[in-house]
């Protein structure tokens, strides 16, 4: 297995502030333990920073314990015990409980650190900061400058924002009047408030000044306009940025001084040793609340200044091998069907390969195709199936099931290695499928002096540096690592692509504490705040076009510069919580890449009561796991702890649980020791809180000892986050700049009776052929004798199956035939053929068929081919020909390629590119001679014409020859590149198969593949003289 990745020299180390020896101190005497903890200055400050409510309850417990009785006492006890356990065992950064630092790879291990190097870094909470900003924007509007929010876009006669930051408004919009367009143009760059007002007065002199002021104030209040006070999310100190901007705009000095006092107190608090800052923290919060009242005005993190921790290069090599294995094991993107793959098909059905569509138009349910299935911010205005098939091959599933039963029988871990994977994984992987970078998390343990790695519960992140981003303010060394990663990212990224940082203030502003980071990327899209980059390098939501490349992957392009953009976010905020547009941009940056973190055992073993330990070589991927339900213990709602103990210990013996295990929820881990009544009590209460059909997940504690140690030889839990980068740069991807055509222009959108009349005919799929071959064909023959019109049809699902029928003629002609059309539609309904008919606008797929100048010829070919297909289906239904529909379809496809004046070799090249070359070989071999004979075009299809029905088929197909030749002449004249020519021919062939076979893409692939096999076999015979060259 080829190595695909290189770990970076440096990684993040995450260490709790308390060593393991403290976690069980006085654990059996619950009252004493509570008193010890509540009098521990370090624990008190940790709780104060994390939960002010619990901190105040500690005071109640110490000063007036009688006030805590019954349920209140029990809840307090549970909360304290859980925090006490997490502070020594959980490495995930949270307030002052766990620290972040930097470690490195070296020749040998160095696992000790200075326990006195822990430090804290407080900064203002982003929610508090934005409340202050909104207050200043409201009170000192006339002193500020404003720009248009990059989250703003115009649709129809209204301007919208992608989302709101008040956490409740589903949609924010204003009328897109001439006044708004004027402000839009003026505030593309920062404009002083007074200049905005002056411009409006000059353009609307008869409008009262108070009305102008109110209009602009409304835009500011709704956040269409954002002030210069709003700090970029990628600067190191947002509060200092605000102070500097306020000073430059002459905000009253007393307010600025209040901010400076807070900044001074924050700096002073940061210098105080952790565990000694309780009093200063309370004073600081009080000062901040005097200015702006908030539930949690301060964000505090802990750091580890000692960077001497080292892991040996052998560990680095093992991690790179694991990263490669994960990628090889992942299903090729072409073999998976998820929400994005399904969206590819929806996009192509609507727009085709040659069209680039504005992002926001595409995602709109009314003007576009809506958001992908599973997107909810906002949800589509139509129902969509969101279930997807198996993501893993049957071979992969069988392999892991076999491994499972072997492991259970032998009572041994599921052991994976390269040799076993060679049996189920393809050793070849396409370059474009290899992710550019990612991160892996490991708990670091020690066995007999050797480092042992355990994959962390949250596994890692999808881009190197994401885990570091939120902590970039903690130290220069963390910022430098991010800078190095972003520079390396630039070197490895496909040369025609620019990486753009998605910098957002989330709809729940407090979540902005997670999205604050530092970025060294070339481009930035900042939503609801200002960008740290120059205007030329800032991207707006309205700037983005979406297309699909020839590898069937989405891409984004800047509509003005033409640059290909890859969007990333240097933080760990959950994309599922983001607005649809932002989530989509992040997801398509990994479109076509292997989903390395979609592990087979997650889904294959998901409902198993017990899962053995899983290992790859010496790395533990998953410790033993169990699921326990209330029903396992016959547990009712009023069960006492004593009643539960006996059935639990029986469960414990039956399933051979260890003495210590974790209750796990995502990366939340709560240590339980069954010989410790305090933690056992916690376990029972956690189980009691679950629903009857909701299990607790239990995970065995790691076998090995904690590896990290302080100068006093105390052991600490430790976790590392290792960035990995692909070894080779991405191959260049050439995407031609397409000639954009106005999305809603009259050349694209044809309203009813504007030369076209488009009707959707909803009917059962079982009666589609009857509708096509008889009703539509007969109706057209009837009206074409009276009116100069033409028509074409195609089949579609939205998701209901229907026929899309279009008539073309002058407006007066279409109006004249409309009464007959209505009578015909009425008769179809009476016959039970059509359940619903809808007249709507016709959106021409201009790019897909070569541009505006070729569209008339393409539509003429659609009309001729529609008549051909109507005749083909009719002949089959009337049994005028005995040739099967599949064979007739093959003949039709090959004859179409001839009518496009492609040589035999060009036909074969086209089919090689548009078929599944390794599929349907058995079926072809079964009737090889028949396929070769009937699909042979030698001597003007002499073999086909020998039979009467073959002759009928030949004459039918010949009727579209002139239209096909004319279109072929035009596309060859318009495009020098054969790929472009083949693309247009492919679209015509696809639409022909759609008319003949319906929306069954699998059958279409089969027909094209059998055509390929037939021509390939003919080529062999022709080369050997068995067939005459045409």
UniProtKB/Swiss-Prot annotation:
Its main location: membrane. Pfam families: Lant_dehydr_C (PF14028), Lant_dehydr_N (PF04738). GO terms for cellular component: plasma membrane. It is found in: Cell membrane. Keywords: Cell membrane, Membrane, Transport. Involved in the post-translational modification of the lantibiotic subtilin. To S.epidermidis EpiB and L.lactis NisB. NCBIfam families: thiopep_ocin. This is Subtilin biosynthesis protein SpaB. The gene is spaB.
């Amino acid at each position: 297995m080829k190595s695909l990745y290189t770990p970076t020299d440096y990684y993040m180390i995450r260490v709790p502030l308390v060593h393991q020896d403290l976690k069980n101190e006085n654990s059996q005497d619950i009252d004493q333990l509570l008193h010890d903890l509540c009098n521990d200055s370090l624990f008190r400050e940790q709780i104060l920073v994390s939960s002010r409510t619990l901190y105040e309850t500690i005071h109640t417990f110490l000063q007036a314990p009688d006030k805590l009785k019954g349920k209140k006492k029990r809840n307090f006890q549970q909360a304290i015990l859980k925090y006490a356990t997490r502070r020594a065992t959980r490495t995930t950064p949270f307030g002052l409980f766990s620290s972040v630092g930097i470690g490195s790879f070296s020749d040998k291990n160095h696992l000790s650190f200075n326990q006195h190097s822990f430090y804290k870094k407080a900064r203002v909470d982003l929610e508090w900061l934005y409340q202050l900003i909104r207050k200043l924007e409201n009170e000192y509007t006339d002193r500020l400058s404003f720009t248009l929010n990059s989250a703003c876009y115009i649709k129809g006669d209204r301007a919208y924002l992608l989302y709101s930051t008040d956490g409740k408004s589903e949609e924010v919009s204003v009328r897109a009047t001439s006044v708004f367009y004027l402000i839009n143009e003026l505030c593309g760059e920062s404009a002083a408030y007074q200049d905005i007002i002056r411009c409006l007065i000059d353009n609307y002199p008869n409008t009262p000044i108070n009305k102008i002021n109110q209009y602009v104030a409304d835009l500011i209040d709704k956040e269409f306009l954002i002030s210069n006070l709003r700090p970029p999310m990628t600067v190191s100190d947002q509060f200092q940025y605000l102070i500097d901007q306020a000073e430059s705009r002459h905000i009253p000095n007393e307010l600025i001084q209040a901010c400076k006092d807070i900044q001074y107190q924050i700096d002073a608090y940061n210098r105080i040793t952790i565990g000694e800052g309780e009093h200063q923290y309370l004073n600081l919060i009080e000062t901040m609340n005097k200015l702006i009242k908030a539930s949690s005005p301060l964000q505090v993190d802990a750091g580890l200044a000692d960077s001497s921790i080292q892991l040996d290069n052998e560990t680095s090599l093992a991690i790179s091998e694991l990263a490669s294995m994960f990628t090889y094991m992942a299903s090729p993107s072409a073999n998976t069907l998820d929400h994005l793959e399904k969206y590819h098909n929806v996009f192509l059905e609507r727009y085709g390969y040659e069209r680039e569509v504005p992002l926001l138009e595409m995602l709109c349910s009314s003007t576009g195709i809506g958001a992908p299935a599973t997107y909810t911010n906002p949800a589509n205005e139509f129902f969509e199936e969101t279930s997807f098939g198996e993501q893993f091959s049957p071979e992969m599933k069988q392999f892991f099931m076999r491994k499972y039963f072997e492991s259970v029988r032998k009572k041994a871990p599921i052991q994976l290695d390269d040799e076993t994977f060679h049996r189920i994984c393809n050793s070849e992987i396409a370059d474009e499928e290899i992710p550019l970078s990612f991160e892996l998390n490991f708990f670091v343990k020690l066995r007999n002096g050797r480092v042992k790695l355990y994959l962390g519960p949250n596994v890692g992140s999808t881009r190197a540096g994401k885990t570091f981003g939120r902590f970039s303010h903690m130290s220069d060394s963390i910022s430098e690592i991010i800078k190095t990663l972003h520079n390396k990212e630039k070197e490895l990224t496909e040369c025609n692509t620019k990486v753009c940082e998605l910098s957002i203030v989330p709809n729940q502003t407090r979540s902005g504490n997670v999205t604050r980071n530092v970025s060294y990327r070339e481009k930035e899209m900042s939503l609801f705040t200002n960008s740290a980059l120059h205007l030329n390098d800032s991207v707006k939501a309205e700037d983005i076009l979406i297309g699909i490349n020839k590898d069937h992957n989405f891409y984004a392009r800047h509509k003005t510069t033409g640059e290909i953009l890859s969007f990333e976010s240097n933080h760990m905020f959950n994309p599922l919580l983001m607005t649809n547009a932002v989530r989509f941009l992040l997801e398509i940056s990994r479109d076509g890449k292997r989903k390395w973190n979609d592990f087979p055992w997650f889904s294959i073993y998901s409902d198993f009561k017990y899962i053995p330990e899983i290992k790859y070589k010496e790395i533990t991927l998953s410790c033993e796991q169990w699921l326990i339900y209330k029903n396992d213990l016959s547990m009712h709602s009023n069960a006492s702890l004593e009643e539960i103990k006996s059935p639990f210990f029986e469960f414990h013996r039956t399933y051979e649980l260890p003495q210590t295990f974790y209750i796990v929820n995502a990366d939340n881990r709560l240590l339980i020791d069954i010989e410790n009544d305090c933690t056992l009590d916690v376990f029972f209460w956690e189980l009691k809180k679950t629903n009857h059909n909701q299990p607790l997940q239990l995970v065995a504690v790691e076998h090995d000892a904690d590896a990290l140690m302080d100068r006093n030889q105390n052991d600490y839990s430790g976790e590392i986050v290792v960035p990995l980068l692909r070894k080779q740069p991405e191959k260049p991807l050439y995407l031609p700049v397409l000639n954009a055509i106005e999305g809603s222009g009259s050349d694209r959108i044809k309203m009813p009776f504007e030369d076209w009349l488009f009707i959707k005919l909803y009917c059962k799929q079982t009666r589609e052929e009857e509708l096509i071959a008889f009703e539509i064909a007969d109706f057209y023959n009837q009206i074409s004798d009276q009116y100069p019109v033409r028509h074409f049809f195609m089949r579609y699902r939205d998701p209901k199956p229907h026929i899309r029928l279009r008539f073309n003629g002058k407006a007066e002609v279409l109006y004249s035939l409309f009464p007959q059309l209505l009578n015909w539609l009425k008769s179809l309904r009476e016959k039970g053929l059509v359940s619903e008919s809808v007249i709507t606008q016709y959106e021409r797929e201009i790019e897909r068929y070569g541009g505006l100048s070729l569209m008339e010829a393409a539509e003429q070919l659609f009309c001729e081919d529609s008549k051909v297909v109507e005749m083909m289906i009719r002949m089959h239904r009337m049994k005028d020909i005995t040739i099967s529909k599949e064979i007739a379809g093959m003949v039709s496809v090959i004859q179409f390629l001839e009518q496009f004046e492609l040589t035999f070799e060009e036909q074969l090249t086209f089919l090689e590119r548009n078929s599944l070359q390794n599929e349907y070989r058995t079926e072809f071999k079964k009737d090889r001679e028949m396929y070769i004979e009937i699909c042979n075009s030698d001597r003007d299809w002499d073999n086909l014409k020998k039979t009467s029905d073959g002759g009928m088929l030949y004459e039918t197909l010949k009727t579209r020859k002139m239209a096909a030749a004319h279109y072929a002449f035009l596309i060859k004249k318009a495009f020098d590149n054969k790929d472009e020519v083949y693309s247009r021919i492919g679209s015509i062939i696809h639409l022909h198969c759609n008319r003949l076979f319906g929306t069954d893409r699998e059958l279409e692939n089969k027909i094209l593949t059998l055509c390929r096999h037939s021509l390939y076999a003919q080529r062999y015979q022709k080369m050997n003289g068995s067939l005459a060259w045409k």
